[in-house]
Amino acid sequence: MTLTTHPPTAVGIIGLGAMGLGMAQSLRRAGLEPSVFDIRADITARFTEQGGTACSSIKELGSRCKIVISVVVNAEQTESVLWGPEGCVAAMRPGSVFVMCSTVDPNWSIRTEKLLAEKGILYLDAPISGGAARAANGEITMMTSGHPDAYALAQPCL
């Protein structure tokens, strides 16, 4: 698979809840400068006030980032992130990777990986554990599975 011309650190995080905000802050400290999106303007403002970059939509984030990390609650929200009217898949380029941090049914994950592969997008199933404090400290646990190419591409963010 041919990778796009995004810099290897072009990473975005969708969902700045307890875990996502801490992950975004940890990536900034590591020098990766993630772009972020959240439906709550106040939490997005909190991140940008600390020097972070926000996108106005999920679609914009998908167009900017080679690595898109979704930190939303469940499969239903992830479906919206991926395929909704402003979803990221329409804007993601072939060779990008979608990292899904929600806990979902394995069959859902397998189906989603196949659908993304049809678009040339790699997929990692990466549920997370550890809580907000550990996320903020860059110490969460990710239980990651997927194609080795997807893992290699996302490795700087994991």
What are these regions (language model features)?
Residues 1-71, 96, 132-135:
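NAD(P)+-binding Rossmann beta1-loop-alpha1 motif at the extreme N-terminus of oxidoreductases
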Residues 11, 103-158:
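Rossmann-fold dinucleotide-binding core
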